[in-house]
From Swiss-Prot:
Gene Ontology cellular component terms for the protein in this record: cytoplasm
Species, as recorded: Bacillus anthracis
Family: Belongs to the ScpA family.
HAMAP family the record matches: ScpA
Record's protein name: Segregation and condensation protein A
């Protein structure tokens, strides 16, 4: 059964690289290419496994990273160093580093502009009559605590855990579950659990097909603003809450 799912919040390969740099506390001026290439390719592989619509620029960046990695492995000859002793320009990572720094600045400016726009909207809109509804509107516009890249990392961890727990011999019975049905099941499950549950507890079935559908259902519920995904710190457990619980 095929599930073609496009997630608009994936902003591109530079966004993914910045996410990895932040997640693993990497110095943007001294990127460990081998490590970040491995992590990047792992994310792209997971995106393909989930049948997300992976844009071609992700694959171009993967090729670029592999090329930089191969150049970093080449022996450095003395004659390749510039006469002034500054070998920084010869660093194969230089161009990528500059692109990441520029993109990071762009993202910061875009975030600031969005915040100012929201502030102006609050100042110049009609006087609020119902303060409860206003509070709900503001909460709806708040950014999610967890990015989709964090969700991919959590799914990778989940798959590794399920694989380790799985018996050596298993009998697979294929089930086809529509994403819409799984979305309804998740909302009911959250209601039973008081509106909040661990992300990992949503995946009670070990069958890969159902796990994929569950993950895509979570993404769809996030996009529809029917659930909130929360994580206190990097690598902490992720929790799923319904909007009615968080309001």
């Amino acid at each position: 059964m095929q599930y073609n799912f496009k997630v608009e919040a994936f902003e591109g390969p530079l966004d993914l690289l910045l996410h990895l740099i932040h997640r693993y506390e990497i110095d943007i001026y001294n990127i460990p290419v081998a490590e970040i290439t491995e992590q990047y390719l792992s994310y792209v592989h997971t995106m393909k496994e989930l049948q997300l619509d992976v844009a071609s620029e992700y694959l171009v960046m993967a090729a670029t990273l592999l090329q930089i990695k191969s150049k970093m492995l080449l022996p450095k000859h003395e004659e390749d160093v510039l006469d002034n002793g500054d070998d920084f320009i010869d660093d194969p990572r230089q161009e990528l580093m500059e692109r990441l720094i520029e993109y990071k600045k762009y993202k910061q400016v875009a975030t600031e502009l969005k915040e100012r726009e929201q502030e102006r909207a609050q100042l110049y809109t009609r006087p609020p009559i119902d303060f409860t509804s206003l509070q709900q509107e503001e909460e709806t516009n708040l950014p999610l605590d967890v990015t989709l890249y964090d969700m991919l990392a959590a799914f990778q961890k989940l798959m590794r855990r399920k694989k380790a727990e799985k018996p050596v011999t298993t009998r697979i019975t294929r089930q086809e579950i529509p994403i819409e049905q799984r979305m309804t099941d998740i909302l009911k499950q959250l209601e039973i659990q008081g509106g909040r549950q661990s992300f990992y507890d949503l995946f009670v079935d070990d069958e890969r097909e159902i796990m994929v559908v569950t993950f895509l259902a979570v993404l769809e519920l996030m996009k529809n603003q029917q659930i909130i995904i929360e994580q206190e710190h990097n690598f902490d457990e992720i929790f799923v809450s319904s909007y009615t619980k968080s309001a």
